[in-house]
Amino acid sequence: KVVRSQIADSPIATITGLSGSLLWTGNQGEIVFDMHVGRELTGGTIEGLAPCSWFELQFKDGSKVTISGTSMLTFADIGQKKLRLKQGAFTADVVPQPVGKPMIIQTPSTVIEVVGTRFEVEALQAFTTVNVREGNVRLKHLVDGNAVDIPANYRVIAEAGGDLSPMLLPAAENYWKSQLDVQAGGFGKWLPATKKRPA
């Protein structure tokens, strides 16, 4: 017979990348500042303590999640991955999840269900932004219970009283041109191009 506390103490993920000031608090209250790539973690809470902090975690099934900046993420996997992004920036590349057991990500204002996709989340107290790169994500607004499916290449900004309609993600710029006619050692301010002058 497997006892639930034994499951909770088993490693569920491995650190695959990190930088900056970070703090991990394990399920049993263990606090660790000295983390390294390759360390296996049970569930717990990871905190990015500085704007330059980032942390990447890979679950046993190959799904990867990353937090960056001043962020706080609690994670567990007892047959289903459940994460709580209290604040900050979060990206995920999720392999297909078992039927009926999507990855659940809760922010202060939303619940996001993921069955397998690549997406980003920014969670603040007042709103949550979800950008979907591949696959689909289901977002439920906690304030009013409204839900929306977000397809690939779309985003939703969920805020109190706001519209949950998906918006097309802006296309990435692949080409630009600049003209820097400044003497060596000179400084200037970038200005966008107008009809009368180049950028």
Per-region residue spans from a language model:
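Short acidic/polar, Gly/Pro-enriched loop/turn segments located at secondary-structure boundaries
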Residues: 1-129, 134-199
